[in-house]
Amino acid sequence: MGVTKTPLYETLNESSAVALAVKLGLFPSKSTLTCQEIGDGNLNYVFHIYDQEHDRALIIKQAVPYAKVVGESWPLTIDRARIESSALIRQGEHVPHLVPRVFYSDTEMAVTVMEDLSHLKIARKGLIEGENYPHLSQHIGEFLGKTLFYSSDYALEPKVKKQLVKQFTNPELCDITERLVFTDPFFDHDTNDFEEELRPFVEKLWNNDSVKIEAAKLKKSFLTSAETLIHGDLHTGSIFASEHETKVIDPEFAFYGPIGFDVGQFIANLFLNALSRDGADREPLYEHVNQVWETFEETFSEAWQKDSLDVYANIDGYLTDTLSHIFEEAIGFAGCELIRRTIGLAHVADLDTIVPFDKRIGRKRLALETGTAFIEKRSEFKTITDVIELFKLLVKE
């Protein structure tokens, strides 16, 4: 299978990215512009264009028609750039302070021109370095509560929502999640990647039919529950942050899926960072886990009471039941994320940079055990505190 490009598609380089910015009139005329390709992800080129005289900058992001991490042997649709720019614009309608502003997009060139966020740091990098970002979980809880509610059936007329489901159909990137999060880590698949010292624990997982059945249920929900427009890849590497500011980026995996998925992915990545820390240094992560759920629950509930179009919205117990369902699935999805980030294709630096090696293996084993417990016991948790306490118990705190 070869790489497919649209007739007008042309891969940008630093000079052509500058030419595009000039053509679009995004800088004052006769500005002297510098450009640097700064992308460190698997799927895109990212150009930082800077006008030193006026101290202005922007980002030009272009999707490439293959996964950079693999090469042209893994072709990917460039339509994901349309998905990303459309998702950012829609998210910006509800939380403009939490996403980058989009200035321009071109579907055929798979280009999105957006606000420069280089004054911020990728949250995963900062957390690994020991930063705690006091407002991170409150901001992400608000992002989740508003974006997930206002794109759902609770807030939209059915015909409008169905048009959005169509607009954000994203089969190729969903396929990546379906395989790398919900399938391959639970079987002896060649995409898996783990240290040989983990093999006994990995094979224990592969031989656990009970957890496989529960993972299958979660996968089915991901496949079939078109509840709302989700980000689809909301980990700490998809967030820029500082002590006071938070911006969610990279929603190219966006589609209509289960509300709990984004919630669970973010929570899992907080726990992954906690595993990279020791003792009291984990406490800020536990506080973030608690805060993100509480803020999401509060924000979602306020939006429900204020703006729900569902005729059943005011029936006593309906909101409570809805939140309980979201919570249960979120913890299950978090378990899948913990496992796949430990033994799947795409690891996280939180675990892979732990030293010495024996300590790293021990923490990865704990990630597998915690992920398995979250999947199997998700219906038993009543509060987010229950989840945190189980995590503490498993990591021997």
UniProtKB/Swiss-Prot annotation:
InterPro entries: Aminoglycoside_PTrfase, Kinase-like_dom_sf, Methylthioribose_kinase. Substrate binds at residues 233, 340. The keyword Nucleotide-binding applies. It catalyses: 5-(methylsulfanyl)-D-ribose + ATP = 5-(methylsulfanyl)-alpha-D-ribose 1-phosphate + ADP + H(+). Keywords: Amino-acid biosynthesis, ATP-binding, Kinase, Methionine biosynthesis, Nucleotide-binding, Stress response, Transferase. Pathway: Amino-acid biosynthesis; L-methionine biosynthesis via salvage pathway; S-methyl-5-thio-alpha-D-ribose 1-phosphate from S-methyl-5'-thioadenosine (hydrolase route): step 2/2. Induction: By starvation. Its EC number is 2.7.1.100. GO terms for molecular function: ATP binding; S-methyl-5-thioribose kinase activity. Disulfide bonds: none annotated. GO terms for biological process: L-methionine salvage from methylthioadenosine. ATP binds at residues 44, 61, 115-117, 250-252. NCBIfam families: MTRK (TIGR01767). PANTHER family: METHYLTHIORIBOSE KINASE (PTHR34273:SF2). Homodimer. Belongs to the methylthioribose kinase family. Catalyzes the phosphorylation of methylthioribose into methylthioribose-1-phosphate. This is Methylthioribose kinase. It comes from Bacillus subtilis (strain 168). The gene is mtnK.
